[in-house]
Amino acid sequence: MFRTSDAFSSFAVPDIEAARRFYGDTLGLDVRDSDESGLLEIHLGPGAPVLVYPKPDHQPAVFTILNLPVDDIEAAVTDLNDKGVEMERYDVGGSTADDRGIHRGNGGPAIAWFTDPAGNIISVLQDTGG
């Protein structure tokens, strides 16, 4: 019924150029113009890219829109902080964040959340090799 190999996700931002700078320059991701319609593609590896589309009346997502596994969460948070990105703190099933904003325990990998310029929630999480 569905061809999952062609499945993709997308999210909205009010300012496509701010998104291009944040995802490309700040996060160092492979960001490309999708076509002449003003969409961006974030290429994260094999498979379909994540589409980013402009929406003037954008409302930030209240959930994590993108999870980025990293080999060293401490280094990733340091790098983000050095680039002016601040970690968010959430109540996650009783776990609390350390002074750097990294949540540990609660049965999952170490994780830290931050927002893009549009207020969408993103995470970096310790890659557990799974």
Protein language model regions, located:
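Conserved short beta-strand elements that form part of the metal-binding/catalytic scaffold
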Residues: D30-D71, E88-R89, G107, I121-Q126
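Intrinsically disordered, low-complexity N-terminal regions enriched in serine/proline/glycine
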Residues: R21-F22, V52, R89, I102
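Acidic active-site catalytic centers that drive phospho-/nucleotidyl reactions
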Residues: D15, D72, D116
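N-terminal beta-strand motif that seeds the catalytic metal site of vicinal oxygen chelate
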Residues: M1-A18, F63-L66, L125-G130
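Core segments of cupin and vicinal oxygen chelate
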Residues: T4, S10-P49, P56, A75, ...
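Generic N-terminal initiation segments characterized by hydrophobic and/or small/turn-forming residues
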Residues: S5, G24, A48, P60-F63, ...
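Vicinal oxygen chelate
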Residues: M1-F2, L68, V77-G130
